[in-house]
C-alpha cells in the first residue's frame, strides 16, 4: 500500500481527527491505487518450472465467436508426445475466469524429425504478440535447432530459431498465415553468418497490421538482424526486408552497428517517428558499444532496412535497448519513444534500472534530451515495457514499466499528458498484493478484454504465474455548495426559536464518465464539517448541526445521494446554527465538503458464475473536497462604513537565532543584502514588523482604519521550511499556519488589526532544505486584508555562502637536520641511507562539517622542495601516505609517485611498516669528516631560506584526493636531506631554513564555496654537523705549495738575521784553566758523611762561588773527575 501523508505538520490536537477521517475514510483507497483493480485481479497458474509467464499477450478473437484470451508463454514446458525431447516450451491460452488452472496448451508444433531438427530446449513461447481484436498471433522458439548430416562426421547444428503465426482462433492455417516461419533456414551457416541467428527472440506486428517483424540478434557474429515481411495478402508489397549486411555498412552517425550488438533483441514500429504518416521500424541493440543503442529504420526499394537515427545509451553495461515501446504520449501526432535500460545503476543516488522517454520533436531526434525514470537498486526497473492505451480516458496514452526484483516485483503505471509523461506514477502494482514473486517480468496491455471500454493489463512473472488487472471506469464528479445567507449578522437571529443565527447549506452532485453509454447508479457519501479551521487550531467549533445523524459529531452532518445515471443532479441540504455568545466574530466560518464513492461489499463468487463487473472509481486527479467561507458583517470601519487600512511592512530582515527569545540580525553585504553562512545553523529567523498607522498624521481619518482579516502571506523557497513563530513581548503572537510541505505560510495579524497597531514577530524557518547548490534565500511577503487597500508583494533576500570548516596543520620530525660526510653523485646512490638525514612530515586536515564528497573534489597538496635553484637535489621524497581521506581504514594514493630514483628503502623502516610499529627516532649515523678543507670565519657565514614561494627552491606538488572523511585525514611524507648538495653549496652558511608548504584545494561547481585557513607552512632548520668540521684529505699540490712557502719564509728570515749580524760570535781573552786530578777520599773523611753522622747537613752556597781572576770559571761539582792511580783506583789530589 502506498504511503499516506503524515498529519503532524502543525502539531495541534485538533488536526488528527479531521484528517484521519478524510484520509482514512475517503482518500486512503485512492492514495493506494487508481483505476486498475487490484482486489479483483485474475490469477492464472502453469506447470511448476515451466516459466509460465515468461511472455504474455492480451488477445481477443471475434470469429467464430467473440472470446477474450490471456496468452502466456512457457518456454520450459514439458514436451508433447512425439516431439522426442524433454522440454520444448509451449504457448498457453487462458480464458477470462476465476479459475486459476484452466489454461490449455495451444496445439502447435507436434512431432519431430530428429534427422533435420532438434526441439530440445527450443524455448517455444519465448515471445508472443497479438494484433489485437480479431487479429493474428505470433509466438516463437528462438533456440530451435536445424540439423544436417546427423550422426556423420560433418554433422552441423544451427540454432536458427523459428516462429508460428496463428489465426485469431489460435489455429494454424498455412494458406492464410504462413504457419511456420524460418527465415534463417537455407542461408549460409556458421555463427559469422546465419548459423546462430536465433530468430524470434523478439517478434511483433506493425500497428497497421500489415507487417510482421522478427528480431534475430545472433546473426553475423551476434551483430543482429531484422526481418520484415508483409502478412496482408491483399497488399502488393510482398517483399521481405532485412537490415544491412556487414559489408553494406553506411557512414555517419546513423551507420550500421558493430558485432556483438544484439540488434533485434527488442523491436517495435509506428507511424510518425521520422515523418508524418510514414511507418518506421525500431530495434534495440542492448550491447552496442557496451552501452546499448536503439536504431530507427526505414525500408527502401531494394528490400533493405536503412538506419536513420541511432540513439545511444549513457552508461556502460546499462542494457539500453533491452526493451522499447512506441506511442504518442502527448497526443501531438508524433510518435514518442520509450527505451528500457534495466542494468543501469547509480551508486550514490541508490538507483537501479532506468527508462528513457524521448519526446519526438517533429521527427528531429538529434537534440532531444530524454527524460529518465529510475527504479530502486537491483530492481531491474525497465526490463519490460507496455503501452496501455488510454487507461483513464483522459485523451493521452499511458505506459507500464516492470521491475520484477523490486521486492516481490512491481509494475509502475505512468500517465501521459500534454507535456509528456507524468514522472510520478499514478499507481504501483505490487506482486506481494497478489502473491506472485518476480512480478512484472513481462507485460501486455492496450486491449480491453472484459468489454468495459477501458484497456486492461496482463502481468507475467518467472514464478509460473500471470495476473490480469482490469481497468475500472473513471467517474468525474461535479459538486456545488450553496450558502444562505452569505454573510452572518449576529444582530439578526433567524432560527426558528428566534434566539440564534442559522445558516442553510445545500450541496448538489452529478457525474460524467467514458463512454457516454456507461451510466451505472452511483451512490456518494458526503460529510459537511463546520468551522474546520478553528478546530484545526485546537479551539471549540462555533457551530452545531441540529439535524445531524446519530453517528455524526455535533459540528458535522453526513448524507448520501444516489445518482441514477450520467448528468443526473441530486442535492442534499442541512442547517447549522451558531452557538450562543460567540466571542470570535472576526474569523470566517469555514465549511468543508468531503465526499467519496460508496463501494458495495465484495461477495465471493463461484468460478462458474463468470467474472463480476468491476466497480467504478473517482478520478484521482480531481479533488474530493471543497471549502467555502462564511464571513461576519464587518464593524468599526468609520462613519462611511468603508475600511481603508494602511498596512505597512515596516521591517523585514533575516536574523540568526541565538536562543528561543534572542535573535541577531545577519551581517550585510556591500549591496545591503544579508549574508547567511551555511555552517550547521538548523534555523533562521525572519523578523517582521507590521504597522497599521495613518499615512498622514494631519489627516488621520483618510486611512489607517481597522484592517479586517489582516494577514501576512509568506511564500518560502524550496530551501526553507516553516517551523514556528516567536514574539519578544507579552502580546499575543500571530497565528501562523502552513501548507502540507511548509512552503507557504499564512499569519493572521488580527481580525481586525486595530488602528494604530504595531506587531513585531519572528518566523522561525528550518534550513534543512538548504543544499550546496543554494546561493540565495528569497522570501516573498504579501500583506492581505479585506479592507480597502492596494497591497504589493515584498521580497526579502539573503546571500548564502558555504564555509568549509577545515583546518590544516603540519609538523616535521626532527625539526633540525645536519649534513656532513662526503660528496656522492646521484648515480652512486643505492639506498635511502646514502642520501642523507631522514625527515618525516605529518600534515593533519581536520573537518568539523559534513563529508567533502557532497561539496566537490577536495585535494590535499604539499609543495615539496626537491631541488635548489640550480637544479641540484634538496629534499628527496621517499614515501607519501594518506590516512583517513578515503574513508575508515583506507589509505589514499597521491600523485606523482615519490622515490623516482627507486632507491632501496631502509630494511628497518620496511619491517616496522609491515608490523605496524610506530616509527622511532633514527639513531645518529657515524659522522664522517667533511671534505671541505678551507676554514670559514663565523663573521662570513650567513642564514639562507630555501622556499619555493621565494624562488630559492623548486617544488614538486604531491596532490592527494580527499574523497570523504568525517573528522581528520593525515598525510605522512618521508624524505631525505640530499647531503651532497649541502656540502657543495652551503658549507659557508650559518644555518638554512627549508620551507615545506601544504594547502587544501576544492574543485567544485559551487560558486559560493568559501575555504579559509586552508594552508600551512612547515619549516625545518639545517646545520653543518659541528663534529664533522675536521679537515682531511688535503690535495698533494696544496701540501707542496705549503712546503715551498715555508722554505721561502725561512730563507728570508735567515737572510735578515745575517744582515743584522746575528750569526757573528763574540771573542774573549785566553784564560788559564785549572787542572784537577782525582783522589780517593775515605768515606769517613767525607764532609757529607760527617754531616749525616752529626745530623746536620750543610748545603753549598752556589751564590758565593770562588773566581780566579776576571776570566775564571766557577768550580762546579759536575766538572770534577777523580784521577786514577796506576792500579786503577782514585788517588788523592792536593791543590
UniProtKB/Swiss-Prot annotation:
GO molecular function: cell adhesion molecule binding; integrin binding; laminin binding; metal ion binding; protein-containing complex binding
Sequence repeat intervals: 1111-1114, 1119-1122, 1127-1130
Amino-acid positions noted as binding Ca(2+) 1 in the UniProt annotation, renumbered to this chain: 328, 330, 332, 336
Glycan attachment positions: 86, 741, 943, 979, 999
Cysteine pairings via disulfide bonds: 94-103, 140-163, 184-197, 495-502, 508-571, 637-643, 736-747, 894-948, 955-960
Signal sequence, renumbered to the chain: 1-33
InterPro entries per the UniProt record, alphabetical: FG-GAP, Int_alpha_beta-p, Integrin_alpha, Integrin_alpha_C_CS, Integrin_alpha_Ig-like_1, Integrin_alpha_Ig-like_2, Integrin_alpha_Ig-like_3, Integrin_alpha_N
Parts of the chain that traverse the membrane: 1037-1057
Main location: membrane
Bilayer disposition of the protein: Single-pass type I membrane protein
Cytoplasmic compartment segments: 1058-1135
Positions of FG-GAP repeats: 38-103, 110-165, 185-238, 248-305, 306-367, 368-423, 427-486
Pfam families membership: FG-GAP, Integrin_A_Ig_1, Integrin_A_Ig_2, Integrin_A_Ig_3
Positions occupied by motif GFFKR motif: 1061-1065
Keywords from the named record: ADP-ribosylation, Calcium, Cell adhesion, Cell shape, Cleavage on pair of basic residues, Disulfide bond, Glycoprotein, Integrin, Membrane, Metal-binding, Receptor, Repeat, Signal, Transmembrane, Transmembrane helix
Renumbered residue ranges of the record's region 3 X 4 AA repeats of D-X-H-P: 1111-1130
Purpose: Integrin alpha-7/beta-1 is the primary laminin receptor on skeletal myoblasts and adult myofibers. During myogenic differentiation, it may induce changes in the shape and mobility of myoblasts, and facilitate their localization at laminin-rich sites of secondary fiber formation. Involved in the maintenance of the myofibers cytoarchitecture as well as for their anchorage, viability and functional integrity. Required to promote contractile phenotype acquisition in differentiated airway smooth muscle (ASM) cells. Acts as a Schwann cell receptor for laminin-2.
Protein name: Integrin alpha-7
Organism, as annotated: Rattus norvegicus (Rat)
Amino acid at each position: 500500500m502506498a504511503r499516506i501523508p503524515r498529519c503532524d505538520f502543525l502539531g495541534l490536537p485538533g488536526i488528527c481527527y479531521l484528517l484521519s477521517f478524510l484520509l482514512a475514510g475517503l482518500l486512503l483507497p485512492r492514495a493506494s491505487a487508481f483505476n486498475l483493480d487490484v482486489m479483483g485481479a485474475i490469477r492464472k497458474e502453469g506447470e511448476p518450472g515451466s516459466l509460465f509467464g515468461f511472455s504474455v499477450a492480451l488477445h481477443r478473437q471475434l470469429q467464430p465467436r467473440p472470446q477474450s484470451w490471456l496468452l502466456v508463454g512457457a518456454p520450459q514446458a514439458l514436451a508433447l508426445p512425439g516431439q522426442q525431447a524433454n522440454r520444448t516450451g509451449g504457448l498457453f491460452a487462458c480464458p477470462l475466469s476465476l479459475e486459476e488452472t484452466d489454461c490449455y496448451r495451444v496445439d502447435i508444433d507436434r512431432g519431430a524429425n530428429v534427422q533435420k531438427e532438434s526441439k530440445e530446449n527450443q524455448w517455444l513461447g519465448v515471445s508472443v504478440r497479438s494484433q489485437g481484436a480479431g487479429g493474428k498471433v505470433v509466438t516463437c522458439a528462438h533456440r530451435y535447432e536445424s540439423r544436417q548430416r546427423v550422426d556423420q562426421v560433418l554433422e552441423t547444428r544451427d540454432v536458427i530459431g523459428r516462429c508460428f503465426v496463428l489465426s485469431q482462433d489460435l489455429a494454424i492455417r498455412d494458406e492464410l498465415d504462413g504457419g511456420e516461419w524460418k527465415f534463417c533456414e537455407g542461408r549460409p551457416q556458421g555463427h559469422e553468418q546465419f548459423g546462430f541467428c536465433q530468430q524470434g527472440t523478439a517478434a511483433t506486428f506493425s500497428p497497421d497490421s500489415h507487417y510482421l517483424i522478427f528480431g534475430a540478434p545472433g546473426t553475423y557474429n551476434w551483430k543482429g538482424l531484422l526481418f520484415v515481411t508483409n502478412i496482408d495478402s491483399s497488399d502488393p508489397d510482398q517483399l521481405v526486408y532485412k537490415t544491412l549486411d556487414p559489408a553494406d555498412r553506411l557512414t555517419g552517425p546513423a551507420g550500421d552497428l558493430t558485432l556483438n550488438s544484439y540488434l533485434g533483441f527488442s523491436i517495435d514500429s509506428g507511424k510518425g517517428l521520422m515523418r508524418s504518416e510514414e511507418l518506421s521500424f525500431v530495434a534495440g541493440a542492448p550491447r552496442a558499444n557496451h552501452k546499448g543503442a536503439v536504431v530507427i529504420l526505414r525500408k527502401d526499394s531494394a528490400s533493405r532496412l536503412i538506419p536513420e537515427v541511432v540513439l545511444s545509451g549513457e552508461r556502460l553495461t546499462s542494457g539500453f535497448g533491452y526493451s522499447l515501446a512506441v506511442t504518442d504520449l502527448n497526443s501531438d501526432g508524433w510518435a514518442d519513444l520509450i527505451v528500457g535500460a534495466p542494468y543501469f545503476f547509480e551508486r550514490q543516488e541508490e538507483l537501479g534500472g532506468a527508462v528513457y522517454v524521448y519526446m519526438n520533436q517533429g521527427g528531429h531526434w538529434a537534440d532531444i534530451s530524454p527524460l529518465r525514470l529510475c527504479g530502486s537498486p537491483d530492481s531491474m526497473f525497465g526490463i519490460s515495457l507496455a503501452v496501455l492505451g488510454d487507461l483513464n480516458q483522459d485523451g493521452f496514452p499511458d505506459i507500464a514499466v516492470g521491475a520484477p526484483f523490486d521486492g516481490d516485483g512491481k509494475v509502475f503505471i505512468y500517465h501521459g499528458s500534454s507535456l509528456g509523461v507524468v514522472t510520478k506514477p499514478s499507481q504501483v502494482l505490487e506482486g506481494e498484493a497478489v502473491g506472485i514473486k518476480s512480478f512484472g517480468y513481462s507485460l501486455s496491455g492496450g486491449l480491453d478484454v472484459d468489454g468495459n471500454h477501458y484497456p486492461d493489463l496482463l502481468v507475467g512473472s518467472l514464478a509460473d504465474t500471470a495476473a490480469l488487472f482490469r481497468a475500472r471506469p473513471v467517474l468525474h464528479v461535479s459538486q456545488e455548495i450553496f450558502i444562505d445567507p452569505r454573510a452572518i449578522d449576529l444582530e439578526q437571529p433567524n432560527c426558528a426559536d428566534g434566539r440564534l443565527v442559522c445558516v442553510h447549506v445545500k450541496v448538489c452532485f452529478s457525474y460524467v464518465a467514458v463512454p457516454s453509454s456507461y451510466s451505472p447508479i452511483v451512490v456518494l457519501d458526503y460529510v459537511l464539517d463546520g468551522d474546520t479551521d478553528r478546530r484545526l487550531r485546537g479551539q471549540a467549533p462555533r457551530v452545531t448541526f441540529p439535524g445531524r445523524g446519530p453517528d455524526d459529531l455535533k459540528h458535522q452532518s453526513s448524507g448520501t445521494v444516489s445518482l441514477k445515471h450520467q448528468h443526473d443532479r441530486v442535492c442534499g441540504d442541512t442547517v447549522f446554527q451558531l452557538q450562543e455568545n460567540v466571542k470570535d466574530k472576526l474569523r470566517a466560518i469555514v465549511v468543508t465538503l468531503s465526499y467519496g464513492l460508496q463501494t458495495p461489499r465484495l461477495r465471493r463468487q463461484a468460478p462458474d458464475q463468470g467474472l463480476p463487473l468491476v466497480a467504478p472509481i473517482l478520478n484521482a486527479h480531481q479533488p474530493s473536497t471543497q471549502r467555502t467561507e462564511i464571513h461576519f458583517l464587518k464593524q468599526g470601519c468609520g462613519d462611511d462604513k468603508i475600511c481603508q487600512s494602511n498596512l505597512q511592512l515596516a521591517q523585514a530582515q533575516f536574523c540568526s537565532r541565538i536562543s528561543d527569545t534572542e535573535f541577531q540580525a545577519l551581517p550585510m553585504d556591500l549591496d545591503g543584502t544579508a549574508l547567511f553562512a551555511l555552517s550547521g545553523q538548523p534555523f533562521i529567523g525572519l523578523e517582521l514588523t507590521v504597522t497599521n498607522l495613518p499615512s498622514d498624521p494631519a489627516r488621520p481619518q483618510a486611512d489607517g482604519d481597522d484592517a479586517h482579516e489582516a494577514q501576512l502571506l509568506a511564500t518560502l523557497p524550496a530551501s526553507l521550511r516553516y517551523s514556528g513563530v516567536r514574539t519578544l513581548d507579552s502580546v499575543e503572537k500571530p497565528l501562523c499556519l502552513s501548507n502540507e510541505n511548509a512552503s507557504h505560510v499564512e499569519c493572521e495579524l488580527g481580525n481586525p488589526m486595530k488602528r494604530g497597531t504595531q506587531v513585531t514577530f519572528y518566523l522561525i524557518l528550518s534550513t534543512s532544505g538548504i543544499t550546496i547548490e543554494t546561493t540565495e534565500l528569497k522570501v516573498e511577503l504579501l500583506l492581505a486584508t479585506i479592507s480597502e487597500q492596494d497591497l504589493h508583494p515584498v521580497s526579502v533576500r539573503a546571500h548564502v555562502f558555504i564555509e568549509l570548516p577545515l583546518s590544516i596543520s603540519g609538523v616535521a620530525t626532527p625539526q633540525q637536520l645536519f649534513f656532513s660526510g662526503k660528496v656522492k653523485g646521484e648515480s652512486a646512490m643505492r639506498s635511502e641511507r646514502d642520501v642523507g638525514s631522514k625527515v618525516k612530515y605529518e600534515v593533519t586536515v581536520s573537518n568539523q562539517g559534513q563529508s567533502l564528497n557532497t561539496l566537490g573534489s577536495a585535494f590535499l597538496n604539499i609543495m615539496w622542495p626537491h631541488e635548489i635553484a640550480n637544479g641540484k637535489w634538496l629534499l628527496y621524497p621517499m614515501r607519501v601516505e594518506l590516512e583517513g581521506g578515503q574513508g575508515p581504514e583506507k589509505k589514499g594514493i597521491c600523485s606523482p609517485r615519490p622515490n623516482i630514483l627507486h632507491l632501496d628503502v631502509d630494511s628497518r623502516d620496511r619491517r616496522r611498516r609491515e608490523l605496524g610499529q610506530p616509527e622511532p627516532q633514527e639513531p645518529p649515523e657515524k659522522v664522517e669528516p667533511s671534505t671541505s678543507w678551507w676554514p670559514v670565519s663565523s663573521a662570513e657565514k650567513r642564514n639562507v631560506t630555501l622556499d619555493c614561494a621565494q624562488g630559492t627552491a623548486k617544488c614538486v606538488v604531491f596532490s592527494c584526493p580527499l574523497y570523504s572523511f568525517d573528522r581528520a585525514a593525515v598525510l605522512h611524507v618521508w624524505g631525505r636531506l640530499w647531503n651532497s648538495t649541502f656540502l657543495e653549496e652551503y658549507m659557508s652558511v650559518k644555518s638554512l631554513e627549508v620551507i615545506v608548504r601544504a594547502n587544501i584545494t576544492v574543485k567544485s561547481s559551487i560558486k559560493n564555496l568559501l575555504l579559509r585557513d586552508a594552508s600551512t607552512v612547515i619549516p625545518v632548520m639545517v646545520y653543518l654537523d659541528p663534529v664533522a668540521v675536521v679537515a682531511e684529505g688535503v690535495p698533494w699540490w696544496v701540501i707542496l705549495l705549503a712546503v715551498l712557502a715555508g722554505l721561502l719564509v725561512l730563507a728570508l728570515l735567515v737572510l735578515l738575521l745575517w744582515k743584522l749580524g746575528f750569526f757573528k760570535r763574540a771573542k774573549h781573552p785566553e784564560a788559564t784553566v785549572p787542572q784537577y786530578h782525582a783522589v780517593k777520599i775515605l768515606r769517613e773523611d767525607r764532609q757529607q758523611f760527617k754531616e749525616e753522622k752529626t745530623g746536620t747537613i750543610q748545603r753549598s752556597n752556589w751564590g758565593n762561588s770562588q773566581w780566579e781572576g776576571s776570566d775564571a770559571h766557577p768550580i762546579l761539582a759536575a766538572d770534577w773527575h777523580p784521577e786514577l792511580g796506576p792500579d786503577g783506583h782514585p788517588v788523592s789530589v792536593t791543590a
